[in-house]
UniProtKB/Swiss-Prot annotation:
The keyword Secreted does not apply. Transmembrane segments: none annotated. Disulfide bonds: none annotated. It comes from Leptospira interrogans serogroup Icterohaemorrhagiae serovar Lai (strain 56601). Belongs to the universal ribosomal protein uL23 family. HAMAP family: Ribosomal_uL23_B. This is Large ribosomal subunit protein uL23. The keyword Ribonucleoprotein applies. NCBIfam families: PRK05738.2-4, PRK05738.3-5. One of its GO terms (biological process) is translation. GO terms for cellular component: ribonucleoprotein complex; ribosome. Part of the 50S ribosomal subunit. Contacts protein L29, and trigger factor when it is bound to the ribosome. Keywords: Ribonucleoprotein, Ribosomal protein, RNA-binding, rRNA-binding. Gene3D superfamilies: 3.30.70.330.
């Protein structure tokens, strides 16, 4: 799999924005910043870490992954399945920042 295809989109929610700002404003010794992104369903933790190293030139300290199953929804009175998707929460130490708009 190409490393450019691993990271799909950043997830912008209130909780993900809090993870970015709370870690950056930490008063403890190490500042940890967490970014939440939607990744390819076949990507694993090491592939996600390599993609961040290559694309953003920043090495993550840890990667947490969650898989969401697609829901069954109705479309024109017929059941249709939404696709499964994967979310990664990537942690950086020492307050490393990423600008997703610049790298797009």
């Amino acid at each position: 799999m190409n490393l450019q295809d691993v990271i799909l989109t950043p997830i912008v929610t209130e909780k993900s924005q809090d993870l970015e700002t709370i870690g950056a404003n930490s008063k403890k010794g190490t500042r940890m910043v967490k970014y939440t992104v939607k990744v390819h369903i076949d990507a694993n933790k090491t592939l996600i870490k390599e993609a961040f190293k290559k694309i953003f030139k920043v090495t993550p300290s840890s990667v947490n992954v969650q898989v969401y199953r697609g829901k069954i929804k109705r479309f024109r009175n017929m059941p249709a399945a939404r696709p499964h998707w994967k979310k990664a929460i990537v942690t950086f130490r020492d307050g490393a920042s990423i600008d997703f708009a610049k790298e797009a």
